[in-house]
């Protein structure tokens, strides 16, 4: 049985229109993202299978773009990447993601949810610093990797997914998409429009639906965060782990992993990483509890202002996760740059960390609730440029680049209220 705590929210329930008093109604807030249907007894009202498929497609696309840099790699084309990015059910494709040695409830995308892809959900807004939408950038990057694959000297090495300026395109694609699809859809579409949703009858008046429009749209926002239903039962170390055995679990004991409820994706794992590497932060708890509390208020037809408050907490938490991750990769980039010209120089690592820094910075633009303003982002992109710097320690260019990156950290620290300690050690 799931433990639950009760929170009190003010809900007006008087029959007389002149009755000015509201009654306090206790709304149960479970510790897991689990809610029963108001309409069909014994059924769950939680539904975000489409988001699960998009999390898998996004993760599998990274596996695919990384693959061309591994020993024994096969050359891939832009069509191979688009088969995931613009996925079609007719392809009958199975996910590349595993749960270690544990069987899966479903491994084909269309068995989890039909008609889902990444391309159809990507923001059309121009990317700050690039002047074109993320979809156009992603297509250019697919083509560059495909062209690199034709060069036998590059295929099977990091050069296969790296452009001529040292940009790790596998990382750029992955990080830009988590912003332009997942973060954008969660905050810019679903949370942004949640207060206008209907919350008293079955979705689309369909008697088979177990949820209202507001319940479903909130679930979809949560689905893009990527957390397992029992997210808070995972430690930060598990969420930050490298293997599925750490960040997934057979919670219901059926001997299988259900990607819809028993696996942690993307942003939810980044939150654990930043909590693990920081002090005095609990982004995992802040975000998850806001999603659960907001959903409980919606299910209990509670105060819409309380829904709005939980929406703000969830959106702010996700922004902090992304911003803290930018800080983390600024620190990694600075560490890599300090080794240039020495025996420990590793440009592959520098290219990787720079692209992660840059890609997550792009991701920050997509929330209407953001504290990191477009002006801040323009400054950050101006600092970072469009490729890594290979200036060696001792040069004026190196000193200026280091000073600029430290300024970038300060911008994020002020905007998000990060402690100096965390900005230094993330």
Mark where each language-model region is.
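Bacterial signal peptide processing site
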Residues: 14-17
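Sec-dependent signal peptide recognition
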Residues: 1-4
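Mature extracytoplasmic or organellar-lumen-exposed domains after removal of signal/transit peptides
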Residues: 21-426
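C-terminal motif of bacterial Sec signal peptides marking the signal peptidase cleavage site
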Residues: 9-12
